Amino acid sequence: MWQLKIGADTVPSDPSNAGGWLSTLNNHVGRQVWHFHPELGSPEDLQQIQQARQHFSDHRFEKKHSADLLMRMQFAKENSSFVNLPQVKVKDKEDVTEEAVTRTLRRAINFYSTIQADDGHWPGDYGGPMFLIPGLVITLSITGALNAVLSTEHQREICRYLYNHQNKDGGWGLHIEGPSTMFGSVLNYVTLRLLGEEAEDGQGAVDKARKWILDHGGAAAITSWGKMWLSVLGVYEWAGNNPLPPELWLLPYLLPCHPGRMWCHCRMVYLPMCYLYGKRFVGPITPIIRSLRKELYLVPYHEVDWNKARNQCAKEDLYYPHPLVQDILWATLHHVYEPLFMHWPAKRLREKALQSVMQHIHYEDENTRYICIGPVNKVLNMLCCWAEDPHSEAFKLHIPRIYDYLWIAEDGMKMQGYNGSQLWDTAFAVQAIISTELAEEYETTLRKAHKYIKDSQVLEDCPGDLQSWYRHISKGAWPFSTADHGWPISDCTAEGLKAVLLLSKLPSEIVGKSIDEQQLYNAVNVILSLQNTDGGFATYELTRSYRWLELMNPAETFGDIVIDYPYVECSSAAIQALAAFKKLYPGHRRDEIDNCIAEAADFIESIQATDGSWYGSWGVCFTYGGWFGIRGLVAAGRRYNNCSSLRKACDFLLSKELAAGGWGESYLSCQNKVYTNIKDDRPHIVNTGWAMLSLIDAGQSERDPTPLHRAARVLINSQMEDGDFPQEEIMGVFNKNCMISYSAYRNIFPIWALGEYRSRVLKPLK
């Protein structure tokens, strides 16, 4: 049976085992790893797990998101004495009472406290993208480490996951809810074959997948990221790739196109890609590789027109078509530049560029304890370390950190979009629980969460000359996940700061000792340092180049990836954190903070659409953007009666309320940039929570509380018998077009919305 282990328990006690290759800043606080123990589990436990798996499989086309049941079953067993309060239901014509809300909240927090880890964070599924596991399996296959790293049980669960998320037409999407794409279909087909599935295995599923691929143009029509993965594997030729010259890293930084000016996720993915392209690295050509060459193309492999294939992309994948200027650039580099740099004397410069690229790869690896900023560059960096030296210590140090990314649920084993969302979820959970005015009842929960947040703050900048490594300051920041990951993020720092400031207002005998003042000042310093000249805040760093650089975006599947754009979410979070800090520490950098808040609020108003909406770039979508837009403006001092932006924002949200109450927004809003209801106009508890929080903050209860009452009824009636809330459609997004799971949101936002509703709507009505 699978068992989730947390923190120091994830490390093998035998130092000769993988634990000897792990380093940590804080005894692995926040680390979450699934282990398989064949001796664990009673027959009843195993039957319960099997039933959950079967139920998911039977309903996989109607409900594509797992409910994270394996983790919940484990925590339920560990907290077997837990008995919740009786369930509450509110009839359609019945008023929502404070008693009903309070009992719902107690039931919700009681349950949510049972799935909190001992170190204070809330573990959960952060999967969703369907292109992550293939990169891992391809890398492990090339390096010969597949069976050593992924046990038979790991491989079985990965296959389960892929079969469960295969679409009816035989293909796979970019993410679990998306229609089939060539990128998803080819990579997941290849993954199954590398894991030992035969071309006719899977009850016809593999054959059906191959048919989808061939019917839609074959692997020659895969996206550029897919072409790269197939090239290193040996089932596609490097001649069919558009160039990624590593010499870009030798250019002067003053050039707008220097990689150091790109969004960190973009540059950290293309960094190892440059290395692999520059070396024209190809793994061993084995019988399975030769077989895949025959299976994936419409013509014999040696007859594929690789030059034509460079710019081929299946229409199903084409979210961001290449502009003409890009095609001209790639053609020039391919036909003129690359032939020169593959031969002496220019090849000497290529070798120098490759050495420089590897230095940056090693810097990233070492400063994230080999976790890396995300799963794509994690496995690419690992492959580069092996390509540089198959026996290197760097390669061995990468291996144990693979497990930080793997998560298992009833739908199988997936690779997460980060090493988790630990800090982010914990900071939100703290704010949600405190909003209920029931904090004193949850001393243990809040004390543990407080400790996690304190333990996860980044305490030092990265070593060396930050400018040379293109890094921003990080001392005082909070990361998205764990301190060992360590990349600083503007909104994570803001939400972490908001949480510890709220906790500092509660008695220390309830929530533990407050964080040191200097660490608060350090966090404020990071936030202030991240404001752009337009007043907005981007994610990890300042915006370092121009929007026109997006013309060079080579990834057909994603939008807005080249530079770190300012966002309503990051700008709002910064305002809220600084405004909260200013109330408690009015003498610290007051003028800078006031100016920062004013400029950020002006920025938020400037990017509001004419219909009153804000596009949410990290959640689905206009309800998420609206929540941040409204809360940011209110925190900056704007009010409904003196701010037209707030009035328009409220009108927009109210216009999207469903007839029966609540809000339900589809992920299609993100990719199409038009508000779209979920199929059948169903409410979603997370969208409903965001909209409620927005309207409450904007004073809706003083004008007409009816929409809030209807929404509260939706949330109360959605609660499950044990106090949990149901997992509904996917609610996270990145780069406009790829969805990602935030499994904790199903608990956090009903609690938060009902908490604010109880304290700010119902109580004042008394």
Swiss-Prot record:
Please write the reaction equations for the catalytic activity of this protein. (S)-2,3-epoxysqualene = cycloartenol
Among PANTHER family, the record links this protein to: TERPENE CYCLASE/MUTASE FAMILY MEMBER, TERPENE CYCLASE_MUTASE FAMILY MEMBER
One biological-process term from Gene Ontology?
triterpenoid biosynthetic process
Documented EC number(s): 5.4.99.8
Q: Which residues form the active site?
A: 491 (proton donor)
Cite the PROSITE patterns for this sequence: TERPENE_SYNTHASES
Residue spans of the PFTB repeats: 155-196, 520-565, 597-637, 646-687
Q: Which InterPro entries match?
A: SQ_cyclase_C, SQ_cyclase_N, Squalene_cyclase, Terpene_synthase_CS, Terpenoid_cyclase/PrenylTrfase
Q: Which domain of life is it from?
A: Eukaryota
Question: Could you list the residue ranges forming a coiled coil in this record?
Answer: none
A molecular function GO annotation: cycloartenol synthase activity
Q: Say yes or no: keyword Isomerase present.
A: yes
GO CC annotations on file: lipid droplet
What is the name of this protein? Answer: Cycloartenol synthase
Q: What does this protein do?
A: Oxidosqualene cyclase involved in the biosynthesis of cycloartenol.
**Top enzyme category:** isomerase
Q: Which family does it belong to?
A: Belongs to the terpene cyclase/mutase family.
**Species this protein is from:** Cucurbita pepo
Q: Which gene encodes it?
A: CPX
Keyword annotations from UniProtKB, A to Z: Isomerase, Repeat
